[in-house]
């Protein structure tokens, strides 16, 4: 047997022993608290957003990146509307936060992130955002922050046509259809959209027009579910295709690039009593063409993911074993790895939960764990958690040619989180604060010869605190979302970044939403404030993005007994210069209209 085979055999034996020990602990602990009325699935204190009439329309006709701007915990990174969108959430960066689809981690293990511009908003639930260290308890590779995506075919008959127009060259058309035949429920969603993204912007005292940042995409989703022999089953398919142009920054325009992406994801789950089995297949193809003068450089890559997940849940425990095979091929890397995860969560009492998680990746075993304490106070629930999680190196970081580093260590977090919720009558107040230390932060750094390579450079500290206040009085809805972030690099091999703030973390972010009835419709006023951000690791002044303030106005109206719903919006009313990435200005004041045509019930 080869040396690699011997290592794999020994590793799998150790992982099997770990799974057996975790499972036996869970079975032994079931007798400790069999009278508890709170299930383990309710162990995390998660805040739900307030959705207005305008939000419901945006949810159907936009992507997750655009919709989540209403949440101050979410910090977007995007060149232009519809372009590739990544995010910072709860103090973490994009690769440290995970995106789950019905419990399956679909964040690419090739790049480490998922482009939120191709995630339809319809997959977002009111409690989809999980901030801070609690994200590690529901993902297989998360450290801090994440999104839980899902949607459901309820069997309710629905047929809606969706139309959207924008003043910057955008057009979208979609259809949402649902119902049932026999005992099988179904729901389908298809949407096509495009935009030239032609909009004015200012640079100093000069006015210009943005061009060359257009995009188009297609999204199709279909779900069937039902019950057979007392077992619940569900099948999903999700297909996306997109093209995104990038004319370059306003300082280096004239070197356009084109990103083409096709992704097919399919999932099937079967659940009977305490047992649930899920299977997932994901295939993605991507081509990036960079135009430099007369030379076109094209980088084509593929990514495949196969995941089989088994869940065994009791009243006081959750047990998970997940086996995945991921491969990345194409121009710049060609590799495949096995990923095995075992997770055990146990409710020891009404107050205490414990989570243990282990993974096999790149012939190594990684471990993580968390303690969660919840108060018994029903009016003011308080929760405290502390733990340590990991972020595994991605395929690109390990095998990118040239520059990959197979000797990378996994990133490691140590953190503590406190959350509290207070609700009385029409007032709801939620507060959370996270303190995290990250070790072995992976950063791409230029080496000798100009080749960039990922290395474990730094240790950093982040503190993220969020306040959510919701007040409903009659026909008026009021929500304030506030997030404050503090970060510092504690240890670094690069002296210029030691003691500096992490990049793309605004020191504060505030979103205020006021929604009320007027003239038989609903008017929504949404104000945004975003603090200073550093975009250079040495925090040089030239890389500072100054604080920005802007407001959006939306008016929603329905008629013909609700068969026609109309929402008009004025974006960036104050015509503020908005920038998420330096030298890529976002649109100033512009307009949009969304129409939803519902069939008769």
Locate predicted features.
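N-terminal periplasmic "start-of-domain" segments of outer-membrane beta-barrel proteins
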Residues: 31-64, 86
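Extracytoplasmic beta-strand/coil segments of soluble accessory domains associated
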Residues: 65-105
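Outer-membrane beta-barrel signature, preferentially recognizing the C-terminal barrel domain
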Residues: 97, 252-267, 381-439, 445-473, ...
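Short acidic/polar hinge/loop motifs at secondary-structure boundaries
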Residues: 104-132
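Periplasmic-side early beta-strands and strand-to-turn transitions of outer-membrane beta-barrels
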Residues: 156, 176-259
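Gram-negative outer-membrane beta-barrel transporters
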Residues: 318, 344-351, 429, 435-437, ...
């Amino acid at each position: 047997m080869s040396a690699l085979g011997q290592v794999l055999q020994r590793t799998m034996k150790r992982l099997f022993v770990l799974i057996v020990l975790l499972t036996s602990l869970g079975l032994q602990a079931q007798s400790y608290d069999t009278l508890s009325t709170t299930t383990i699935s309710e162990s995390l204190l998660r805040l739900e957003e307030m959705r207005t009439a305008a939000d419901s329309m945006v949810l159907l006709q936009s992507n997750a990146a655009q919709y989540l701007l209403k949440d101050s915990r979410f910090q977007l990174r995007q060149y232009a509307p519809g372009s590739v969108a990544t995010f910072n959430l709860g103090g973490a960066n994009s690769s440290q936060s995970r995106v789950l689809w019905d419990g399956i981690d679909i964040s690419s293990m090739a790049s480490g992130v998922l482009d939120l511009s191709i995630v339809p908003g319809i997959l977002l639930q009111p409690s989809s955002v999980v901030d801070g260290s609690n994200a590690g308890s529901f993902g297989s590779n998360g450290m801090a922050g994440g999104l839980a995506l899902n949607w459901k075919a309820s069997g309710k008959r629905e047929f809606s046509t969706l139309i959207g127009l924008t003043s910057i060259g955008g057009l979208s058309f979609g259809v949402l259809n649902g119902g049932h035949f026999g005992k099988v429920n179904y729901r389908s969603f298809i949407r096509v959209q495009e935009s030239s993204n032609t909009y004015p912007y200012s640079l100093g005292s000069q006015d210009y027009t943005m061009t060359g940042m257009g995009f188009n995409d297609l999204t199709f989703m279909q779900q069937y579910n039902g019950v057979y022999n007392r077992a619940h089953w569900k099948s999903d398919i999700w297909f996306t295709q997109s093209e995104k142009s990038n004319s370059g920054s306003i300082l280096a325009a004239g070197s356009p690039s084109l990103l083409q992406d096709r992704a097919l994801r399919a999932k099937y789950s079967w659940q009977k009593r305490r047992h649930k089995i899920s299977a997932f297949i994901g295939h993605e193809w991507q081509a990036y063409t960079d135009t430099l003068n007369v030379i076109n450089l094209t980088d084509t890559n593929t990514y495949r993911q196969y995941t089989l997940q088994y869940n065994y849940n009791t009243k006081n425990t959750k047990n998970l074993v997940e086996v995945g095979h991921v491969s990345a091929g194409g121009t710049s890397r060609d590799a495949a790895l096995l990923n095995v995860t075992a997770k055990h969560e146990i409710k020891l009492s009404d107050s205490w939960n414990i989570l243990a998680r282990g993974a096999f990746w790149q012939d190594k075993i990684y471990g993580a764990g968390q303690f969660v304490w919840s108060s018994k106070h029903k009016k003011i629930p308080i929760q405290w958690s502390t733990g340590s999680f990991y972020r595994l190196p991605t395929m690109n970081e390990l095998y990118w040619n040239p520059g990959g580093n197979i000797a990378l260590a996994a990133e490691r977090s140590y953190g503590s989180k406190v959350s509290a919720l207070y609700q009385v009558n029409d007032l709801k107040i939620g507060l959370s604060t996270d303190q995290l230390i990250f070790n072995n932060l992976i950063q791409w750094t230029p080496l000798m010869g100009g080749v960039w390579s990922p290395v474990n450079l730094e240790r950093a500290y982040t503190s993220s605190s969020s306040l959510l206040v919701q007040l409903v009085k009659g026909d008026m809805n009021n929500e304030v979302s506030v997030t404050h972030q503090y970060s510092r690099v504690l240890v670094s091999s690069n002296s210029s970044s030691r003691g500096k703030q992490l990049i793309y973390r605004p020191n504060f972010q505030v979103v205020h939403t006021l929604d009320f009835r007027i003239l038989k419709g609903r008017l929504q006023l949404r104000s945004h404030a975003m603090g200073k951000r550093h975009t250079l690791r040495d925090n040089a002044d030239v890389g500072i993005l100054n604080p920005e303030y802007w407001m959006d106005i939306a008016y929603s109206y329905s008629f013909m007994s609700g068969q026609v719903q109309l929402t008009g919006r004025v974006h960036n009313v104050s015509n503020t210069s908005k920038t998420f990435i330096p030298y890529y200005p976002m649109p100033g004041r512009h307009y949009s209209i969304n129409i939803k045509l519902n069939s008769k019930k």
